[in-house]
């Protein structure tokens, strides 16, 4: 339709001019009604412009039923053209039902309307969203049939689709055959390698790129974070800043999450300062990441401060602060935040209840915990999951209600997993209940036969009861199943640098000689106040002298010695480790906090331990 005819239509029907200023779904429906009454909907040009408003993401906030409404408009168009079909294919390719985009493509071909280079990128997008390479390959054959295989936009879509579906070799072949590669082509390959876990290949391609944009940096940093290369994610962010590239909220979420996993508080604080100084919009995702990072790095007070200052919150951000308070041992404060969350109208999710029940467990709030567990389904319609069952078992076990905990496990609607059984076995050790421990331990070894920690825990329970023949049987079972203990490691951040110490690999650190001498000094001081090595958690197939030597080389002891060496007196020492703290290390850390007057914060696999003046926040139950 010519501009003259369009202007004539606008002159005769002034409401058509409102199409460009439509600002809400209500406006759209009013204009739609006008077009129906005036029969202008029968004009394909006018109808297509109305349809375009439905699919344009920048026009107004879209209701959930928008796709259905768009299809209703489409059904009123008598002779839809290629522009209309492309709009619908685009709309559905990025929606909840991307497969429906192919229905419009089939209808388009039946109407003898042929696709163009706009059609295929959206069809490829749909197959990528479906993560169905078979549909993608069929679309690829259609691309070749209609001669668009050398179009750069189509090629970029194919590279992205194959990479997103995990077919990185196919993506690489198309990339290699491209006559022209733009930043999108390169970034799609980087993203594909990251998704397949091939971060070294991704970095190699990233470094080869002639030009990079912010999205490329974001993809590579996020790729490192998603593949547990947290230090590399932080290093690349530092390199990005040196290159003069300004980060956005997406980049900072990846960086801050990496700090959280490493327990890198110093760098996390610098990242937070960067967010503030850059005047970034602290949206829900970034805000929750900041809260999560601070409590995971051991600074629960800063986490509370950031949470209280968030411009907006949702159920996930509330769940994060509640979980943080729970693992730091602030049960009553966690319950206060949970009550506040409910009173403000936020709907708790399953992760919220995991956090709240964990708080009840750590705080010994048995009756309250059972009440919340019962109300979870009754008042909020949330079915219990393994995580919730685990919290209840842990809570009952901590309270010494071992029979109730075992009975709860037997009545569960699902098969118990290793963490649930492990929680009860740990309680059996604390309360020296060999009878329940044997039943639970045998179940546990069947569920997780390769986990060395459960054998050691059960053997310690037998040792306390003097049942040496059963210890011998466990030792034989471990040898038969080739069970090996995973290497323990501990991280400590000094001057913004992460230092990693690994059990049995103590010669890698360049200052290991000084560290060992510092540890001997610490050992001498804590022995003066009665310390004797507790070898209970050491493997039971070595002699006592070897056990004594091995426990003094545990990774957290080396990390603590290094921290004492490198920081001023009175400085808080923060350690992150991958395994549960053993009894000897727990005792040693309490004594160090008493002798040296320092606070030590240790994050292990289960929780945070705050050591002050010879006392731990876990109250010796972990």
Curated annotation (Swiss-Prot):
Q: Which domain of life is it from?
A: Eukaryota
Picking any one GO molecular function of the record gives:
RNA binding
Matching InterPro entries: DYW_dom, E_motif, Pentatricopeptide_rpt, PPR_At4g14850-like_plant, TPR-like_helical_dom_sf
PPR repeat residue intervals = 81-115, 116-150, 151-181, 182-212, 213-247, 248-282, 283-313, 314-348, 349-384, 385-419
Q: Which UniProt keywords apply?
A: Repeat
UniProt KW Repeat keyword = yes
Residue ranges of the region described as Type E(+) motif: 496-527
Sorted alphabetically, the Gene Ontology BP terms of this entry are: RNA modification
- Region Type DYW motif, residue ranges: 528-622
- Which Pfam families does UniProt cross-reference here? DYW_deaminase, E_motif, PPR
S-S bridge residues:
none
Q: Which Gene3D superfamilies match?
A: Tetratricopeptide repeat domain
Q: Where is this region: Type E motif?
A: 420-495
Report the sequence similarity comment from the record: Belongs to the PPR family. PCMP-H subfamily.
Could you tell me which NCBIfam families the record lists for this protein?
PPR
From the Swiss-Prot or TrEMBL record, give the protein name. Answer: Pentatricopeptide repeat-containing protein At5g06540
- Organism field: Arabidopsis thaliana
What gene is this protein a product of?
PCMP-H88
């Amino acid at each position: 339709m010519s501009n003259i005819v369009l202007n004539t239509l606008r002159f005769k029907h002034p409401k058509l001019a409102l199409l460009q200023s439509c600002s809400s779904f209500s406006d759209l429906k009013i204009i739609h009604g006008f077009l129906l009454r005036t029969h202008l909907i029968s004009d394909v040009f006018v109808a297509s412009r109305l349809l375009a408003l439905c699919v344009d993401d920048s026009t107004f906030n879209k209701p959930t039923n928008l796709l259905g409404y768009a299809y209703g408009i489409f059904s009123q168009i008598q002779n839809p053209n290629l522009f209309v079909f492309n709009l619908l294919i685009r709309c559905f390719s990025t929606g909840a039902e991307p497969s429906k985009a192919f229905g419009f493509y089939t209808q388009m071909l039946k109407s003898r309307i042929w696709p163009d280079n706009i059609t295929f990128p959206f069809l490829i997008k749909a197959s990528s969203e479906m993560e169905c390479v078979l549909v993608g390959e069929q679309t690829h054959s259609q691309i070749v049939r209609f001669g668009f295989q050398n179009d750069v936009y189509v090629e970029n879509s194919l590279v992205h689709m194959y990479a997103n579906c995990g077919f990185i070799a196919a993506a690489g072949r198309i990339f290699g055959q491209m006559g022209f590669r733009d930043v999108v082509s390169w970034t799609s390959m980087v993203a594909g390698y990251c998704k397949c876990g091939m971060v070294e290949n991704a970095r190699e391609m990233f470094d080869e790129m002639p030009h990079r944009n912010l999205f490329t940096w974001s993809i590579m940093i996020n790729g490192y974070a998603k593949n547990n290369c947290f230090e590399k994610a932080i290093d690349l962010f530092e390199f990005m800043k040196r290159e003069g590239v300004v980060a956005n909220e997406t980049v900072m979420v990846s960086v801050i999450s990496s700090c959280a996993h490493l327990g890198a508080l110093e760098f996390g604080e610098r990242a937070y300062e960067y967010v503030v100084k850059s005047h970034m919009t602290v949206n829900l995702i970034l805000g929750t990441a900041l809260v999560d990072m601070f409590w995971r790095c051991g600074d629960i007070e800063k986490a509370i401060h950031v949470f209280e200052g968030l411009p907006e919150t949702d159920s996930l951000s509330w769940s994060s602060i509640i979980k943080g308070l729970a693992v730091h041992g602030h049960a009553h404060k966690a319950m206060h935040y949970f009550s506040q969350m409910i009173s403000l109208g936020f709907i708790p999710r399953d992760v919220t209840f995991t956090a709240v029940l964990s708080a009840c467990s750590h705080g010994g709030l048995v009756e309250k915990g059972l009440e919340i567990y019962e109300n979870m389904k009754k008042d909020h319609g949330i079915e219990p999951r393994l995580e919730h069952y685990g919290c209840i078992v842990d809570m009952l076990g901590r309270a010494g209600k071992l029979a109730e905990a075992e009975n709860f496990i037997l009545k569960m609607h699902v098969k118990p997993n290793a963490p649930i059984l492990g929680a009860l076995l740990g309680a059996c050790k604390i309360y020296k209940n060999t009878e329940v421990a044997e039943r639970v331990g045998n179940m546990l070894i069947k569920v997780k036969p390769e986990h060395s920690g459960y054998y050691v825990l059960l053997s310690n329970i037998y040792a306390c009861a003097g049942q040496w023949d059963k210890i011998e049987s466990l030792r034989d079972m471990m040898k038969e199943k080739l069970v090996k203990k995973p290497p323990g490691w501990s991280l400590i951040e000094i001057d913004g640098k992460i230092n990693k110490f690994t059990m049995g690999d103590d010669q890698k650190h360049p200052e290991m000689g000084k560290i060992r001498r510092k540890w001997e000094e610490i050992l001498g001081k804590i022995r003066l106040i009665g310390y004797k090595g507790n070898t209970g958690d050491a493997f039971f197939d070595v002699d006592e002298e070897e056990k004594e030597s091995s426990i003094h080389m545990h990774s957290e002891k080396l990390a603590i010695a290094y921290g004492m060496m490198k920081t001023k007196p009175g400085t808080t020492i923060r350690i992150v480790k991958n395994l549960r703290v053993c009894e000897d290390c727990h005792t040693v850390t309490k004594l160090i906090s008493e002798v040296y007057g320092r606070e030590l914060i240790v994050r292990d696999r289960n929780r945070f331990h705050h050591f002050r003046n010879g006392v731990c926040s876990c109250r010796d139950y972990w």
